[in-house]
UniProtKB/Swiss-Prot annotation:
Annotated EC: 3.6.1.27
Disulfide bonding pattern of the chain: none
Name of protein: Undecaprenyl-diphosphatase
Catalytic reaction annotation: di-trans,octa-cis-undecaprenyl diphosphate + H2O = di-trans,octa-cis-undecaprenyl phosphate + phosphate + H(+)
Species this chain originates from: Buchnera aphidicola subsp. Acyrthosiphon pisum (strain Tuc7)
Gene from which this protein is expressed: uppP
Coiled-coil features, chain-numbered ranges: none
UniProt-listed GO biological process terms: cell wall organization; peptidoglycan biosynthetic process; regulation of cell shape; response to antibiotic
Compartment annotation: Cell membrane
Top-level taxon: Bacteria
Annotated signal peptide: none
Amino acid sequence: MLDLHQIIVSIIIGVIEGITEFLPISSTGHMIIASHWLKIDNENTKILEIFIEFGSALSILYFFHKKILRILKFNINVKKTNTKNLHIILAILPTIFFGLLFYKKIKLLFNTYNVMYALILGGIFLLISEIFKPKKYKTCSINDISLLQSAIIGFFQIFCLYPGFSRSGATIGTAILLGIKRSVAIEFSFIISIPLIMGASFYDFINNMHNFKILDLPIFFIGFMISFIVSILCIKKLLKIINRTSLIFFGIYRFIISGLIYFIN
């Protein structure tokens, strides 16, 4: 019989992930904070978070699947694009390399205090991106993103390994500083997130399989489905919000949350 408390927790964490994944405020950071405040910060929760993150990744894949098919040239009925697979590889390779190299050390950073500092640093970066962005866009289409731009975005994406910094915040902020149109920056950011989130979820699961219990699968599935459904329902609206809202607003929000963490803890 399913435990009601576990079901409620699974739903709460799933909703948090489904909403925060598409905003530059760090979904991982918010899940860590929620787990701590709900007093469920244990090994079992790590497995739950893996399933939940995978759910949001699938929603991104579903939402952008047509664009991804164009980029990968799997669909012969669509117009060919200039964005090659190499752009995606350059954008994700640095994070994969450092993520694997420092995997155990990175996991030691998964606590509320480190998230608090990362929220502040990420907030400062968002402010810098908005204040010092070029007055005119140099890149107005995802097909026009250069290999150099992809590589630079990939380098700054490394900061997302610090829980609480925000992967989308790092990539969107960097892209905007490089003169990439905001809507294009958002689109590219989430397309390159798919292999990273799915790969990280799989690798985390392999490393935490000893904590996996088949009896907990229904709870994990509930979290997965809640995350997927909420993400599907929210993604279009939230992406519009990012496109129309100054990054300064998200930076201020991050400062407020980090302040709450400090005073509550």
